[in-house]
Structures are given as C-alpha cells and as structure tokens.
Regions:
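Well-ordered, non-membrane alpha-helical segments in soluble/globular domains
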Residues: 67-68, 102-110, 146-154
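Leucine-rich, highly hydrophobic segment in Treponema pallidum outer-membrane-associated proteins
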Residues: 1-100, 116-119, 202-206, 210, ...
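C-terminal/domain-terminus segments
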Residues: 105-107, 236-242, 322-324
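Beta-strand-rich interaction surfaces with strong enrichment in secreted/lumenal proteins
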Residues: 74-75, 108, 168-170
C-alpha cells in the first residue's frame, strides 16, 4: 500500500486521528536536483484535532554515508539580512561526479568538498544571484582547483575580447583568495559603462561573477557584493545569519517574508516594464502586489529539527516552525 512506500503505518482507530495528510516525495520536491541531497526523502503535512503538523523524512544511512548536518559553518558565513535561506547536507561523490562532465581534474577533488552547504537570497540582489556557501577541506594542491574550475567554466563568449572571454582577476584580501570575471548578460546587474573593458562586452549589462575561498569556506555568487559581504561576516566585521538563527537544534531553512516580498516585487517590476508590458504590468499591480503586501506582514520563521541522524529508511522527524 502507499502508506508503506512512504514509511507510514496503517491508520487504526486506536491511533490519534488524522483528518488530512499530504505526503510528497523528494523526487517531486527536488525538481531533478534530489541527487544532490540523497539523505532527503520527503515531507509530510498532517491535520489533526489540534491543527497542522509537519515532518521531514530522511533516507537510510546508505544514501548519505558521510553527510554532515552541522550547518553552523553555513550560518557563520552568510551575511545577516537574508530573505530566504536553505542549508543542505553534502555527501561525498555527488559534486565530483557532476564535475567529471566539465573537467578532467575532478578526481583530485575527492574528499575535499565537505560538510553542509547553503544558499541565501537577498532583497537588494536578484532572484538569479543567490549566495552559495560550501566547505572545502582539501590539501594545498587541491586548494588550487576551485580557481582553475572557475577560470575554465565561468564566463560568456565575448567575440570582441582577444581570447573570446574576458580575463579572470585573482586577488588576495587578507586570508581570502578571490577570483572574479565580468560576464555579459542582458540580465546583468551592472551597466556596460562600469566594466573594466566595456568595449569588449557583448551585452549592455554584465555580472561580476565572484568566487572566494577563505580557510575552509567557499563562497560563490553572480553578485560580487554578496561575496564581499560574506567575507566581512567571516571576519566578524558584519553581522552574520548565525546571530539570527537559533542555536538549539538543526536549522535547515530560514524565511523572511518581508525580504521575500521585496525581492519578488523588484523582480516582477523589472521584468514587466510599464511602457513595454502594460497589460501584464497592470495585472501584476492588481493581483500580485496586494498578495506580496500581505506576505510582507508575516513574521520571520525558521524550520527547526531536534535531531537529524540518518537511520532507517523513511525516518520521519517532526518539524518545529519557530517565529523570530
């Protein structure tokens, strides 16, 4: 029966009655990315006599032999003020296998990517430019590989540039090594005039894509400002998300409705210029903006788990939604 396929027992009269139950597998929630978080099995929402309750399911230990659920390094690196954040456990071998399609040196990364990883979106940035934080625990030789992969694979074809791509700038900032490349894009954050070599860009806008590594922390974003802010958070010169996130329990999710509403509002208005898309612009103003205004009035929340250790398959863990 379907209950057994989700690790659930048959309902009986003796058990606490469940009026409604929604169970979603990670195969659906992952949108094809579930292989990146093999420890995640699914989510469940139940309505009983005392209201709604939610649960998160883990796969068995074989799906994530060396996954880490310690997300403290992620929250230490993320600058405060995020609109939405998610942290996930990393399992060895997943990223290395993916990198094998773009680099012959992926085998040298084995065991170097470690711990948890996280993504955060910020209201003053863009929807397509979140900040990624990961953990790198490799040798001195392996520490050179992220920069090589960045140089080989990050960029756009710039036919006006002598080498067909704009150069990568590599700088040292304190203990951090930083790689940056300007990349043409019609959706870029900066106008062409602000580029180091504007005559070589193929678009009127560009991203200043950045990768940084400081000690064991990897930072990446299409928005260079977010990487700079994260370095400041690491160096204790800017507040970090760890100052906001509760320290008791495991926190894989942070939601700031006010920041989310502002980010979505900015993205909507940017993609629907009033003079070019008057019909959709008016529809957004009438139907979407009131809902975003209502969203912005909601409190901030974190998803909190008391413990998170893979055991048997479909291990259901109760979720606490804690307001901040």
């Amino acid at each position: 029966r379907w209950q057994a396929s989700f690790g659930l027992e048959e309902r009986t009269a003796e058990k606490t009655p469940v009026r409604q139950r929604i169970v979603v597998s990670a195969r659906l929630l992952g949108f094809g990315y579930q292989r990146l978080v093999p420890s995640f099995a699914g989510m469940r929402f139940e309505m009983g006599n005392d209201g709604w309750h939610s649960f998160l399911a883990l796969n068995d230990e074989s799906a994530s032999v060396d996954a880490s659920f310690d997300f403290t390094p992620v929250w230490n690196s993320m600058p405060a003020g995020a609109s939405f954040c998610v942290a996930v456990p990393y399992s060895h071998g997943i990223a290395e296998e993916m990198l094998s399609h773009i680099s012959q040196e992926n085998d040298k990364l084995n065991g170097a990517l470690d711990g948890g990883a996280g993504l955060c979106w910020y209201e003053d940035s863009k929807l397509q430019t979140p900040l990624f934080v990961g953990q790198f625990d490799g040798t001195a030789e392996q520490a050179q590989l992220p920069g090589k992969l960045f140089t080989q694979n990050i960029g756009a074809h710039e036919s006006k540039a002598p080498e067909g791509v704009l150069p990568v700038s590599q700088t040292q900032q304190g203990e951090a090594q930083i790689w940056r490349r300007e990349v043409s894009s019609r959706y870029g954050q900066y106008p062409k005039a602000q580029a180091a070599q504007p005559d070589q860009l193929m678009s009127d806008y560009f991203f200043r894509v950045s990768l940084a590594m400081q000690n064991k922390t990897l930072l990446f974003s299409l928005d260079d400002t977010l990487v700079n802010n994260a370095l400041q958070a690491l160096n204790k010169t800017r507040p970090a998300m760890v100052d906001v996130i509760p320290t008791d329990g495991i926190v894989p999710l942070y939601i700031n409705p006010q920041g989310m509403a502002k980010l979505l509002r900015n993205e909507t208005l940017t993609s629907l210029p009033k003079n070019l898309e008057p019909v959709f612009y008016n529809a957004a103003q009438t139907l979407l903006m009131p809902k975003l205004d209502a969203l912005s009035q909601q409190p901030r929340y974190v998803m909190k788990l008391a413990q998170m250790e893979p055991g048997a398959a479909w291990q259901w863990l109760p979720i606490t939604w804690q307001p901040l």
